[in-house]
Design a protein with these regions (language model features):
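Metal-dependent catalytic core segments for phosphate chemistry
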Residues: 91-140, 178, 182, 186-187, ...
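Short, charged/polar low-complexity linear motifs in solvent-exposed/disordered segments
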Residues: 28, 110-112, 144
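Common nucleic-acid-contacting/processivity interface regions adjacent to the catalytic cores
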Residues: 1-97, 150, 158-212
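Extended, charge-enriched "interface" segments that sit outside catalytic cores
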Residues: 124-134, 139-163
Length: 212
């Protein structure tokens, strides 16, 4: 019974906590802490570790304040058909990188480089997810008109499931990186929580976003 319990716990952990373990690999905190801390806390831990390793002082926390946010308009109330949704891929992180929105508090210019690393890693796993998903769909379409033996069909089905599992695994890896990258802007706008926060940088990010 003990082996069964351990096996079940291992599978549940693998399904639900893989992403936390993945993020914890780049955080200077214990795994248990990584599972419970917020994303602003994660960026704080990364930057504090960087500062200590490079002999840099930690900026003094500042009070938070209001700034102009994203553009929002309600043009019509009620049921609306023929609606099209357009979504930018990591809008705010992309704006920060494109326009190099960097705080003067970051004297080593490390924050933007770290954000670029996170986004680059995310795109890598997104590409792997897409490749695996495409292969799974190709096999699925092949099975619709497949006229081979039952053993060949069974082997193709196993291969399809393997590619689907690969796509799912890479999706789970890209998602926490997406969340971490998107929270970079939130950290900018919370200098009371994130010592490297900068309201001017946060407002410049939303300003460019409104004009995009």
């Amino acid at each position: 019974y003990l082996y069964d319990d351990l096996w079940e716990c291992d599978k549940v952990e693998y399904a639900l906590n893989t992403t936390n373990f993945f993020i914890c690999k780049i955080l200077p905190v214990p795994f248990a802490k990584c599972c419970t801390m917020g994303t602003a806390g994660q960026w704080k831990a990364i930057m504090m570790a960087w500062s200590y390793e490079n002999g840099l002082a930690i900026p003094k926390a500042e009070n938070s304040g209001a700034f102009t946010g994203g553009l929002s308009r309600l043009l019509r109330v009620g049921f609306v058909d023929n609606v099209i949704k357009l979504d930018y891929n990591s809008l705010y992180p992309s704006i920060i990188l494109t326009w190099y929105i960097s705080s003067g508090l970051d004297i080593s210019n490390s924050m933007v480089s770290m954000l670029e690393y996170v986004l680059t890693q995310r795109e890598k796993y997104k590409d792997l997810k897409g490749e695996a998903g495409a292969k799974a769909k190709k096999i699925k379409k092949l099975l619709e008109t497949f006229e081979g033996s039952e053993e060949e069909r069974r082997n193709l089905k196993i291969e399809q499931q393997a590619w689907e599992a690969e796509a799912s695994a890479n999706d789970k890896k890209q998602l926490p990186l997406k969340i971490l990258a998107n929270s970079f802007f939130g950290s900018f706008g919370a200098p009371n929580v994130f010592p490297f926060g900068d309201l001017i940088c946060a407002e410049k990010t939303t300003c460019v976003g409104r004009m995009s």
